[in-house]
Swiss-Prot record:
GO molecular function: chloride channel activity; extracellular ligand-gated monoatomic ion channel activity; ligand-gated monoatomic anion channel activity; transmembrane signaling receptor activity
Keyword Transport: yes
SUPFAM superfamilies linked to this entry: Neurotransmitter-gated ion-channel transmembrane pore, Nicotinic receptor ligand binding domain-like
Taxonomic path: Eukaryota, Metazoa, Ecdysozoa, Arthropoda, Hexapoda
Gene3D superfamilies with a match to the protein in the record: Neurotransmitter-gated ion-channel ligand-binding domain, Neurotransmitter-gated ion-channel transmembrane domain
Function: Ligand and pH-gated channel that mediates chloride transport in the mid-gut and thereby may function in larval metabolism and fluid homeostasis. Channel opening is triggered by zinc binding or, to a lesser extent, an increase in extracellular pH.
Protein's recorded name: pH-sensitive chloride channel 2
Source organism (scientific name): Anopheles gambiae
Family: Belongs to the ligand-gated ion channel (TC 1.A.9) family.
Name of the gene encoding the protein in the UniProt record: pHCl-2
Topological domain ranges for the Extracellular compartment: 29-387, 435-447
Signal peptide: 1-28
Biased composition (Polar residues): 97-106
Cytoplasmic side: 409-414, 469-596
Length: 617
């Protein structure tokens, strides 16, 4: 198997033979000088013979096996060539005289291929090579029109022609920022003025801490290299273009520091507008859609106010090379039809600052320094209409419904339990629906304070029912010193035996409620009394056992019928010591009646404190 190098060598040998034959055939009419040298390692020396070629009577030495091959031009007299072929690894076709001059220049592989073309195409190929050399980035300006096009007669040039000459590599480098002379003569920073127009702003998404805008960002700066006022005095309109024009110019790289995602708007093409004024002022306008982070404070949710900023920063150049400034007139403008459904815009303000970046935080890649920054902030307040109708008013109604149990009798357990538990579950469901739209934060929010307050009142009504139901089922009367909240609740929680002083005898009553004999029960629902008289001992020598006597049921009922309890305007059974006897049912009813007023008044007081905190603290 032959190696690729051997195959290439055979091909070059055939090519040399073909060229030698062509030279020999045309030697009678024209004495060209062509040198073609092929070595084993792939070296070729050749001069294409053509009358129109500027390379006539020159030898071009090309090293094919090295990048950026070198061509050597050797001027030779126009003597007939001699051809010598031997069995060595080198074939040479050359004239018999030594070269008189030698010049060198670098040729690309494309030029080498063109040298191997037939003679008829050499002139066109050489023109192509010259044009390629003029447009190379590393080409040096020599002052010739072919290398650096002139700006004379710019008034008669088209916009594309003028732009092509202004941005030619001989006079413009798009990788280099514009130079601006400062007061002391040094190269000062480029001043870039910014302006923003907000088309659309989406409501803040609290659970993602972000908002979305559609805006037009415009940057204005002066590039002295693009001034054409002197060369084209009659051209007063700016040069306009889109993305293609922007790609030819130096443009400041400004990024959104709090960006989550962004994109340039546009359908068929991106919405980028670039203009160059005669005085060199460049304006670049871009329509963007951006999703930005907004770090919200939800402590007063849903009565919160948020400050959301859009931050612009210079990416590549620090403040020594580039300074960002807001336009003095209307730096940020909102579209008249812009309307937010959940928020109301209170104010908007702009700011110019400097951001310090060091190598530790990598804020600007591997660069450290002070970078210019711009920001505009919107102050938004949340609208309360939705939350009032969807959360606060329904929760107030649920709390009020829980108070209906105070008008039901204490022994009606089923309706009171059903009403209390259903109210509690409904309110928890209502509150959980609101919490799903919020992020999970560690601090307490205003909505959670409201939730805890309403839950406390609903739970309090359930506790009140359990309390009065327990008292209702007691079978022992309660004696209170005074019929007020302090004494009634104290005796209801920790009941004591009834006290009655009977002229030296301590008399106590106990009753047994017989539910089965409801038809014979007295007005106070007591049908059996046992009276125990205790005779105090006069001295230690007296009888050691007390005398106990019982009365029959009729006498007990007769005596009990003479006892009355003071309940809302009725006379109470007050003994000589000022104690009042109340039945358990009367205590339960008394607590329910007081709860009908205490709970609403307490809820009103809670609302006063809550709404004062929300709006004034």
């Amino acid at each position: 198997m032959h190696s690729p190098g051997a195959a290439a060598y055979v091909f070059l040998q055939c090519l040399v033979a073909l060229v030698a034959a062509v030279i020999a055939q045309s030697g009678a009419d024209q004495p060209p000088t062509t040198v073609v040298e092929v070595t084993a390692h792939g070296s070729v020396s050749m001069t294409p013979p053509t009358p129109r070629s500027p390379l006539l009577n020159e030898t071009e030495l090309v090293e094919l096996n090295q990048p950026g091959s070198t061509a050597v031009f050797v001027a030779l007299p126009t003597n007939p060539p001699t051809v010598s072929v031997d069995s060595s690894s080198t074939t040479t076709v050359a004239s018999t005289q030594e070269p008189t001059s030698t010049t060198e220049r670098t040729m690309s592989p494309e030029e080498i291929q063109k040298l191997l073309l037939p003679p008829a195409t050499v002139e066109a190929d050489i023109l192509h090579v010259n044009a390629t050399d003029d447009n190379r980035p590393d080409a040096k300006s020599s002052g010739k029109d072919s290398e650096c096009p002139t700006l004379e007669g710019a008034d008669h040039l088209s916009q594309t022609q003028l732009l092509t000459r202004l941005t030619h590599v001989c006079r413009y480098d798009r990788l280099e920022r514009p130079k601006r002379e400062s007061i002391n003569g040094t190269n000062g920073p480029v001043k870039v003025y910014a302006r923003a127009y907000i088309y659309f702003m989406q409501n803040l998404e609290a659970h993602d801490l972000q908002f979305k805008i559609h805006a037009l960002l415009q940057f204005r700066y002066v590039d002295p290299r693009l001034v054409f006022r002197e060369v084209a005095p009659n051209r007063t309109k700016p040069i306009m273009g889109e993305q293609s024009l922007r790609d030819l110019l130096w443009v400041p790289h400004v990024f959104l520091a709090n960006e989550r995602s962004s994109d340039i708007l546009g359908t068929a093409e991106k919405d980028i507008l670039t203009s160059i004024s005669p005085d060199g002022t460049v304006i670049v306008s871009t329509r963007i859609s951006a999703t930005l982070y907004c770090w919200m404070n939800l402590q007063k949710f849903p009565f919160d106010e948020q400050h959301c900023s859009t931050v612009l920063e210079s990416w590549m150049y620090n403040e020594d090379d580039l300074v960002l400034l807001w336009e003095h007139k209307s730096p940020v403008t909102l579209a008249p039809e812009l309307h937010l459904t959940e928020y109301v815009l209170l104010e908007m303000f702009t700011n110019e600052t400097v951001i310090n970046a060091d190598l530790s935080d990598l804020r600007h890649g591997a660069f450290a320094g002070n970078y210019s920054s711009l920001s505009f902030t919107v102050h938004l307040a949340r609208e309360m209409g939705f939350y009032m109708m969807d959360y606060f008013i329904p929760s107030i109604m649920l709390v009020a419904i829980s108070w209906v149990t105070f008008w039901l009798q204490a022994d009606q357990s089923a309706p009171r339990i059903t009403l209390g538990t259903s109210t509690m579950l409904t309110f928890i469901t209502l509150a959980s629906a609101q919490g799903k739209t919020l992020p999970k934060v560690s601090y307490i929010k205003a909505s959670e304070i409201w939730f805890l307050g309403c839950t406390g009142f609903i739970f309090g009504s359930l506790v009140e029912f359990a309390f009065v139901n327990t008292i209702w089922r007691r079978k022992r009367n309660v004696e209170v010193k005074k019929v007020n909240s302090k004494h009634v609740l104290k005796q209801a929680i920790t009941p004591r035996p009834a006290r009655k002083d009977m002229s030296g005898l301590h008399k106590s009553h106990s009753c047994t409620s017989l539910a089965d004999s409801a038809t014979t029960v007295s007005a106070n629902s007591f049908n059996n009394y046992l009276t125990v008289h205790s005779i105090p001992q006069k001295s230690p020598s007296s009888a050691t056992l007390p005398i106990i006597s019982t009365t029959d049921v009729d006498r007990a009922m007769t005596e009990a019928s003479n006892v009355t309890i003071q309940i809302e305007g009725q006379t109470s059974n007050v003994n000589g010591n000022g104690w009042t006897t109340m039945t358990p049912q009367e205590v339960a009813i008394w607590i329910d009646k007081r709860s009908r007023f205490v709970f609403p008044i307490a809820f009103v007081i809670f609302n006063i404190f809550y709404w004062t905190f929300v709006y004034y603290v």
